[in-house]
């Protein structure tokens, strides 16, 4: 797939740490996010999967995206029933239902980046990205992105999130809320 996606699509760049997680996404159509480390808004249009060092030759890149179909809160025990003795078996996770994985051609390499946590971007940035750094929303667009995410949050009424006040935020605060570090 090329990178033809709506420019205003909301995208969450999510970390894929294991090949097994990629297979779960491909075969069963879901991705898990621990509630305690989840970003503020899960109700986005797409997930873009950043593949870590465990992916061998395909490491440190975004190779796949998937449309988000919905999400629910559950436990790790319910998601991964073959791991009843896992230390986090009773912790809560978002189970994000996704459509089929779409391969990005070419994939988006990390470049100098290696350690990535969740962050938001848009379809416009994804279309033009040559490296992961190109997905970082510029200062002048951060307020627009944050407003779109807040509107989505209000519409979806996600778990445990109350009304959010309308305030103008400084760029550093916006960057932190969007998962952007050191930019």
Give the residues covered by each predicted segment.
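Structured alpha/beta reader/binder surfaces that contact nucleic acids or chromatin modification marks
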Residues: 2-183
